[in-house]
């Protein structure tokens, strides 16, 4: 931001400088915005005017996207899709859920107050606990085998069923998810079932 009083520039940190980012309708964003989001997701930093700013930890990005058939959407680059741990496809809401949505969003109801249930330090501590969950070499090999099985030529009969094989990053995410599943199940070790569940 230019300051006309003294001719100086200062950085104004935008909404991406948060612990939790919700990128709504990410595939409606133009390529330049998607590229900026890709940098922050990969590098955990933002570059403004040649200067880099590290993101505070923990840093998490959630995103929504519209069906690609809808007008005004852009396909997400594979490099960006690969940065997300998982994709959850949500069905339409039930009748009761849709009524509650209508009442809440189109009615005169005040939005409920939201209180923090965990601090950034709490989330960092939980991450450390999850990362300390033991994964035997056999489980790690299982995860690598699952990831490699998605690639062209890996298994007979799979050609044409998988659009793009999983990257090495998919194995990393699957290990993180399996550890989290084991942790939430009250165990300090990972089983192949934890990975299958994801």
Each model region followed by its residue ranges:
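Conserved alpha-helical scaffold flanking the Walker A/P-loop in AAA+ ATPase domains
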Residues: 2-22
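Glycine/charge-rich, flexible interdomain linkers and switch-proximal surface loops
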Residues: 12-15, 56, 158-165
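Short aromatic/hydrophobic contact patches that present stacked aromatics
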Residues: 20, 87, 163
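Basic, amphipathic alpha-helical bundle interface domains used for macromolecular binding and assembly
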Residues: 106-198
């Amino acid at each position: 931001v230019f300051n006309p009083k003294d001719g100086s520039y200062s950085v104004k940190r935008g909404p991406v400088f948060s612990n939790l980012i919700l990128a709504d309708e990410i595939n409606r964003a133009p390529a330049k915005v998607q590229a900026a989001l890709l940098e922050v997701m990969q590098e955990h930093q933002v570059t403004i005017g040649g200067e880099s700013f590290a993101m505070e930890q923990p840093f998490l990005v959630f995103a929504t996207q519209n069906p690609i058939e809808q007008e005004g959407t852009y396909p997400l680059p594979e490099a960006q899709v690969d940065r997300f741990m998982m994709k959850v496809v949500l069905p339409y809401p039930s009748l009761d859920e849709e009524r509650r949505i209508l009442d809440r969003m189109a009615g005169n109801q005040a939005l409920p107050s939201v209180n923090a249930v965990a601090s950034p330090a709490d989330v960092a501590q939980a991450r450390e606990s999850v990362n300390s969950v033991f994964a035997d070499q056999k489980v790690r090999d299982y995860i690598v085998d699952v990831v490699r099985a998605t690639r062209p030529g890996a298994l007979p009969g799979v050609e044409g069923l998988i659009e793009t094989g999983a990257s090495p990053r998919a194995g990393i995410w699957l290990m993180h998810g399996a550890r989290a599943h084991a942790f939430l199940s009250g165990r300090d070790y990972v089983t192949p079932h934890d990975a299958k569940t994801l």
